[in-house]
């Protein structure tokens, strides 16, 4: 978009087997679960909006939610955040120092309901002149990653816990959005060469015809976040936003430069995704999927969803017809 650049998905907890981290120590599911504190009320020191009633930390990284969000969603989010940055406490510290936090939407809450993203309700998207800004953003995003100016990221509880009706059931939104936050609130504060190097890799990938017409071709930020999803074996494949690449092995073969950036940031820690229903133990012990609510798009957003999907499909058709020289990135 032109005036507003908060990275949101258009549209992933993990079973962690014992792996070797970049430092040689095993990263295990037990390690992740033992690191999780209890869900509590937000501490006064967090200075949160009264909207938030629940709070947890992943190694000091704050995760917040309203009273309507399941405690299990907060614990799952903390688990994933802990494991993704198992090798990079320095990046996590930089994110926290920048003011970053993760905000979880209840299944019946939407992006502009969150205090950190309420301002989007007044930010008209120029490609959708017939849509109210609030409807556009509420239909467009079940997760946002933040950027250099906006510290916060978000995701929906229905995706974290695998509720019926989850519109993005084939992937984990937290992994994508947290990747943006790791990039733009963490890594770039530690290594000022990272973003210029990533931009150059993106430019070369576009010149080589990689990711043509797919979401990874939108800009270098989405290029990285989509790569991170595949690095953790968690992406959709073969639809209007994705090609066949959805695993680490496929990413290494298809775009080794992007894989190298993922390795640089995350090392060899691996998340092997399975739905919560397959692993009701440890931090999910006691969770009963049969009692979970269903996610339903409200009627007020149906037209916005139709227009957004048509736009995404048209983007894919146009870019697929363009020469493999790249095009100006249009960020979201």
Residue ranges and their predicted role:
Residues 15-31:
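Bacterial Sec-dependent signal peptides at the C-terminal "C-region" and cleavage site
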Residues 51, 58-61, 69-209, 241-244:
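Acidic/His-rich structured neighborhood in mature extracellular/periplasmic domains
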Residues 228-332:
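Pan-zinc metallopeptidase signature
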Residues 7-15:
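Bacterial N-terminal signal peptides
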Residues 1-7:
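Bacterial N-terminal signal peptides that target proteins for export
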Residues 194-251:
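An amphipathic alpha-helical core segment
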Residues 47-48, 54-55, 198-201, 311, ...:
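Ser/Thr/Asn(+Pro)-rich, low-complexity disordered segments
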Residues 26-79:
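N-terminal mature-domain "stem" immediately C-terminal to a signal peptide or N-terminal signal-anchor/transmembrane
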């Amino acid at each position: 978009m032109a005036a507003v650049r908060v990275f949101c998905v258009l549209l992933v907890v993990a079973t962690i087997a014992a792996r070797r981290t970049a430092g040689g120590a095993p990263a295990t599911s037990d390690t992740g679960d033992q690191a999780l504190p209890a869900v509590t009320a937000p501490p006064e020191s967090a200075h949160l909006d009264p909207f938030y009633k629940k709070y947890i930390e992943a190694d000091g990284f704050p995760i917040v939610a309203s009273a309507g969000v399941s405690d299990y969603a907060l614990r799952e989010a903390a688990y994933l955040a802990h494991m993704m940055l198992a090798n990079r406490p320095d990046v996590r510290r930089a994110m926290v120092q920048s003011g970053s936090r993760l905000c979880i939407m209840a299944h019946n809450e939407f992006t502009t309901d969150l205090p950190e993203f309420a301002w989007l309700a007044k930010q008209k998207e120029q490609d959708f002149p017939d849509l109210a800004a609030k409807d556009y953003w509420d239909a467009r995003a079940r997760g946002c990653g933040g950027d250099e100016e906006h510290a916060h990221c978000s995701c929906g509880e229905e995706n974290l816990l695998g509720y019926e009706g989850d519109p993005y059931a084939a992937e984990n939104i937290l992994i994508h959005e947290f990747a943006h936050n790791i990039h733009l609130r963490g890594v770039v504060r530690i290594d000022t060469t990272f973003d210029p190097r990533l931009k150059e890799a993106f430019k070369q990938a576009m010149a080589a015809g990689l990711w043509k017409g797919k979401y990874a071709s939108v800009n270098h930020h989405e290029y990285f976040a989509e790569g991170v999803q595949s690095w953790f074996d968690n992406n959709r494949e073969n639809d209007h936003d994705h090609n066949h690449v959805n695993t680490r092995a496929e990413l290494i073969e298809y775009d080794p430069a992007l894989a190298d950036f993922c390795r640089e940031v995350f090392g060899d820690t691996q998340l092997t995704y399975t739905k919560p229903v397959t692993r009701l133990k440890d931090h999910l012990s006691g969770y009963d999927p049969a009692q979970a609510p269903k996610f339903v798009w409200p009627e007020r957003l149906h037209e916005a969803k139709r227009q957004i999907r048509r736009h995404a499909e048209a983007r894919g058709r146009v870019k697929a017809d363009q020469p493999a020289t790249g095009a100006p990135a249009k960020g979201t």
